[in-house]
Amino acid sequence: MSARIGAHVDQADPLAEAASRDADLVQFFLGDPQSWKKPSVAYAGGAAALRADAEAAGVDLYVHAPYVINVASTNNRIRIPSRKLLQQTLSLAAEIGAQGVIVHGGHVTADDDPSAGLDNWRKCVEGLDLAVPMLIENTAGGTNAMARRLSTLEQLWDAISAASGFEEVGFCLDTCHAHAAGEELAGLVERVSAITGRIDLVHANDSRDGFGSGADRHTTLGQGQVDLDGLAEVVRSAGAPIVVETPGEGHLDDLAWLRRVLAD
């Protein structure tokens, strides 16, 4: 088994959370994911201590950006604070030595031209100081989402590939979101890689809802409606670190399943 695996955990002591799961990596928020407040480090001793202790423990850190961020938006009151909060998150993630910051692709409204959202993403990448990689994540629903369907993801990648700093932009593939968006997991890694050229992180999640539902409701691996054979194919073929974002009480079972699949 070569892939490093872990889970999304509480931010207060992510290293203790990693140890309790025998995890190689952890993902967490830097503050309230539903707030516009400036991100902060909850770990005792702050950013420097977390970085040093993570390095000593051999645990990789990933930061999930707040859900409120939507840099694709044509609404100035959403887009401008989104860019500011994203930059603050990236900068603090660099201080703790994070491997990357995961951010959702965002959306425009039904009245907007989708190309405006794509161009807003390009401008965002141009304006960011990417001290750590930014990993754009596919999303589950939304007719006007930038990263739900592969056809739109291809347009997004075409738009941002022209931006300076693009080399620090990667992709996070979420299996629950792909399932909810109506994307078959079989062959998905190849289809995504043909667009992005890279997969930097996998969110290995099951779904409480049916294929193409558009619903973003994760559940424990094997207890939902995601095809487990397809999920196994994704984690084996992506060649990327893996995070489970499933209910915490099932993390040990989920990580054990991943270890078995990756060992086969």
Give residue ranges: language-model regions.
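Aromatic/hydrophobic pocket-lining residues that form the small-molecule binding cavity
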Residues: 11, 47, 82, 86, ...
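Gly/Pro-rich active-site loop or hairpin
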Residues: 112, 146-150, 154, 177-241
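Acidic (Asp/Glu)-rich catalytic clusters
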Residues: 16-23, 42-62, 88-97, 126-131, ...
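Active-site beta-loop-alpha junctions enriched in small/polar residues
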Residues: 8-12, 31-33, 66-68, 106-108, ...
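N-terminal pre-domain/capping segments
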Residues: 1-65, 69, 73-88
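C-terminal helical cap(s) of enzyme catalytic domains, especially alpha/beta-barrels
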Residues: 251-264
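Active-site acidic/histidine proton-transfer and metal-coordination neighborhood
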Residues: 55, 71-170, 180
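Hydrophobic faces of well-ordered beta-strands that scaffold small-molecule active sites
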Residues: 3-9, 26-28, 61-65, 101-103, ...
